[in-house]
Amino acid sequence: MTEPPDPTISAVPAVPVETPAPRPDATVMRRPTPLLVLDVVGLTPRLLDHMPHLKRLAQSGSHAPLGTVLPAVTCAAQSTFLTGAHPSEHGIVGNGWYFRDLGDVLLWRQHNRLVAGDKLWDAARRAHPGYTVANICWWYAMGADTDITVTPRPIYYSDGRKDPDCYTRPPALHDELTAKLGTFPLFHFWGPGADLVSSRWIIDATRHIIRTRHPDLTLCYLPHLDYDLQRFGPDDPRSLKAAADLDAAMAPLLDDARAEGRTVVALSEYGITRVSRPVDINRALRRAGLLEVHTQDGMEYLDPMASRAFAVADHQIAHVYVRRPEDLDATRAALDGLPGIDQLLHDEGKKDHHLDHPRSGELVAIAEPDAWFTYYYWLDDAHAPDFARLVEIHRKPGYDPVELFMDPLDPYVKVKAATALARKKLGMRYRMAVVPLDPSPIRGSHGRIPESDDEGPLLICSTPRAVGDRVAATDVKSLLLRLAGLG
């Protein structure tokens, strides 16, 4: 039998049972910190004094010398930044190389599948599914698993005409950018007319994409310093003015990033140093009987498939392809005494410099600090191919910085250029044959490992204490993941 309640004991109010606060849904993830990564080509500590906006960013944030790779050229360095791997692993051994299976030298390819390794965006998406990436003019953009792509892509008409344009993903972005900014200024991106116009267009495109798409990671390539520093050298007043002009053009983009709370990283692939000695490496191989040409209509063309040895010149680096092992000694003998060559790497040397990849030449030549390699292989300018006097980055079997100049020895060069431009505007075929065959005007180059940090690349971050005393090129990927909150 249950006893009745004792009336002398007052009722105790019921204690409400606390309902636990709902746990955050594990599938709801905090957004990564948005990043803007500016590839300011040719930026060095010395140039920073002429770039007040970037310098303030470095002073309020953090900065450090940035190690580079061999070769210190655009495609190899960018591929290392985005994969965290050396050229021996990702396979980008220069801005181009000899495709042995095709028997052809090809530079400035665009398919991202050429780059091996785990890309930055793949690592980011494993940590944060749905991570979005915009690539505005970094190389190997086509076919990459990025959400937004803008990259130079001329229109090649069937009659041989070439008009400026760009490639975008999604495709509708092409007309959107063209309507807002005008046609991509290809002839201001490279060639005798290369100037600030191209970098301004890229900056404006980047601002538009950030404002309308808000990608988690935005990669932006700014080439302006590449032009006058190669034309005139890094210490010339015109080069210092180019640095100041680019800095002023970047200011609105930096302001946009700050207003959005976007972390900014500005880095460079290499520093450009003063040079005065062109080295005709292919002419030396030809005189030694190792390089072969074939002739059509009086013009000589490199015959890489028949040559016992030839070089793919790429600024201060040249991959030397030797068809048979028994020709290695003769090739070395032809190059060992050539003025302007600092080192000739074979298997062990390539391994030491992380260049031991099947795409590399059997030998790799490194120029002395004040020298650089031409691609020229003809011995008489009367037999040069007609493309030698044109801006033809896809036909020349090596890099040609002389394309930045109009021929100073041709009194009619401006008339020729104007005539070609008039024919172009009328929709007629034209040849802009204005490029000199004299390499001596070039005053700046890159490709070697720099002699000092002052001459080398730099990394700046808007976040204080984000970097230590030095950053390796292979550490850029992990740094960006950490800055995004994904490392």
Task: Give the role of each language-model region.
Residues 46-89, 132-134:
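Short, structured active-site-proximal loop/turn typified by the sulfatase FGly-forming signature C/S-X-P-X-R
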Residues 35-40, 59-65, 73-78, 95-109, ...:
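Glycine-/proline-rich flexible loop or hinge segments
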Residues 30-46, 57, 81, 124, ...:
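Beta-strand elements within well-structured catalytic alpha/beta cores of enzymes
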